[in-house]
Swiss-Prot record:
GO molecular function annotation: ATP binding
Keyword Cell cycle attributed: no
Main location: cytoplasm
Quaternary structure and interacting proteins, as annotated: Component of the chaperonin-containing T-complex (TRiC), a hexadecamer composed of two identical back-to-back stacked rings enclosing a protein folding chamber. Each ring is made up of eight different subunits: TCP1/CCT1, CCT2, CCT3, CCT4, CCT5, CCT6A/CCT6, CCT7, CCT8. Interacts with PACRG. Interacts with GBA1. Interacts with DLEC1.
Alphabetized UniProt keyword annotations: ATP-binding, Chaperone, Cytoplasm, Cytoskeleton, Hydrolase, Nucleotide-binding
Protein name: T-complex protein 1 subunit alpha
Organism: Mesocricetus auratus (Golden hamster)
Gene Ontology, cellular component aspect: centrosome; chaperonin-containing T-complex
Residues bound to ADP: 68
Gene3D superfamilies: GroEL-like equatorial domain
General function of this protein: Component of the chaperonin-containing T-complex (TRiC), a molecular chaperone complex that assists the folding of actin, tubulin and other proteins upon ATP hydrolysis. The TRiC complex mediates the folding of WRAP53/TCAB1, thereby regulating telomere maintenance. As part of the TRiC complex may play a role in the assembly of BBSome, a complex involved in ciliogenesis regulating transports vesicles to the cilia.
Length: 123
């Protein structure tokens, strides 16, 4: 776990660059996983433990936005929803801006699957 991970609501900064996950406990790790998960494999013998933490982190996170154009797709959906609260001219401008983000997410065919998955999750 990165030393700047948020653990139990406070920013945990240690002078050590590697924190032993056994010292933290399951609840602290799940709280950290809610905000983001970063795993550095330092001991390949502990793959079962790493698998457990990845599964626990995945269960703690309510939604996952994959990479590959997902940020543009998420922003497009957010802007489309926001546009409905605006007046007519502003709504048209924001909707067009949202369409531009959506088109950018669909440009690269390699990213199409990840983008479609992100749209399904976010809607």
């Amino acid at each position: 776990i990165h030393p700047t991970s948020v653990i139990s609501g406070y920013r945990y900064i240690s002078e050590n660059l590697i924190i032993n996950t056994d010292e933290l406990g399951r609840d602290c790790l799940i709280n950290a996983a809610k905000l983001g998960v970063q795993v550095v494999i330092t001991d390949p013998e502990k793959l079962d433990q790493i698998r457990y933490f990845v599964e626990a982190g995945a269960m703690a996170v309510r939604s996952v936005v994959p990479g590959g154009g997902a940020v543009e797709a998420a922003l497009s959906i957010y802007l489309e929803n926001y546009a409905t609260s605006m007046g007519s001219r502003e709504q048209l401008a924001i909707a067009e801006f949202a369409r531009a983000f959506h088109n950018e997410a669909q440009v690269n065919p390699e990213r199409k699957f990840a983008t479609e998955a992100a749209i399904t999750i976010l809607r």
